[in-house]
Curated annotation (Swiss-Prot):
Disulfide bonds join C31-C162, C49-C65, C97-C255, C141-C209, C173-C188, C199-C224. GO terms for molecular function: serine-type endopeptidase activity; toxin activity. It comes from Bothrops jararaca (Jararaca). The lineage of its organism: Eukaryota, Metazoa, Chordata, Craniata, Vertebrata. Belongs to the peptidase S1 family. Snake venom subfamily. Residues 25-248 form the Peptidase S1 domain. One of its GO terms (cellular component) is secretory granule. This is Thrombin-like enzyme KN-BJ 2. Residues 19-24 form a propeptide. Its main location: secreted. SUPFAM superfamilies: Trypsin-like serine proteases. Thrombin-like snake venom serine protease that clots fibrinogen (FGA) by releasing only fibrinopeptide A. Also releases bradykinin from bovine low-molecular-mass kininogen (KNG).
Length: 257
């Protein structure tokens, strides 16, 4: 069994805000207010995801985060005490490799969102560039998001939590999840000893390896941070040509097979 890391209506009923910084994304710590300028909070109804600002008008997230009347919040740190430079947009257009209803957890869990108007760079808002090359196994990668910070129940953090994990060989995830295909356009990342991981509510957020935006939170173990069960992230470098084509105006561009 695997867990898609989006916060659903049934889970939101268990929602409570974290009171202790020591209740650690899973195993993380509150992010520095200045280290997540490209991180977007994506909300619609009772659902929560994250996204990544890649230029003033475009955000990348996971296809399984798609929803109606989606709002994209930039410049957010504390959800209770908004930054003065917080900016909120809605999705003008959304692009997928597959229908958002037909994505698979093995492949193409990616959504490119065009905002209804550009955001302005500010103290807490700035885009991150697409990767110039694929990541290297063994890289230290940063994860971040407002998802649950407890494995026993859904406890959403008021501020994003950050943690460092390792980029692992894809074969490690195949050993953990035998149903995985021999190859896929995903990255395997985590801590084999367990304890640090993305979790429910972190879907769509970034995996930043050696300063480059390399992955999108997709799915993982039913128990976040479990030993020998790392998570899977959409491999951004495989989609840069498609992303750049869409942004350039070629809305019929096709994704890699």
């Amino acid at each position: 069994m695997v867990l898609i890391r989006v916060l659903a209506n049934l889970l939101i009923l268990q929602l409570s805000y974290a009171q202790k910084a020591s209740e650690l994304i899973i195993g993380g710590r509150p992010c520095d207010i200045n280290e997540h300028r490209s991180l977007a909070l994506v909300k619609y109804g009772n659902f929560q995801c994250s996204g990544t600002l890649i230029n003033q008008e475009w955000v990348l997230s996971a296809a399984h985060c798609d929803g109606e009347k989606m709002k994209i919040h930039l410049g957010v740190h504390s959800k209770k005490v908004p930054n003065k430079d917080k900016q909120t947009r809605v999705a003008k257009e959304k692009f997928f490799c597959l229908s958002s209803k037909n994505y698979t957890k093995w492949d193409k869990d990616i959504m490119l969102i065009r905002l209804d108007s550009p955001v302005k760079n500010s103290a807490h808002i700035a885009p991150i560039s697409l990767p110039s090359s694929p990541p290297i196994v063994g890289s230290v990668c940063r994860i971040m998001g407002w998802g649950t910070i407890s494995t026993s129940k859904v406890i959403l953090s008021d501020v994003p939590h950050c943690a460092n994990i390792n980029l692992l060989n894809y074969t490690v995830c195949r050993a953990a999840y035998p149903e995985l295909p021999a190859t896929s356009r995903t990255l395997c990342a985590g801590i084999l000893q367990g304890g640090k991981d993305t979790c429910v509510g972190d879907s769509g957020g970034p995996l930043i390896c050696n300063g480059q935006f390399q992955g999108i939170v997709s799915w993982g173990s039913d128990v976040c941070g479990y030993v020998l069960e790392p998570a899977l992230y959409t491999k951004v470098s495989d989609y840069t040509e498609w992303i750049n084509s869409i942004i350039a105006g070629n809305t019929t561009a096709t994704c890699p097979p």
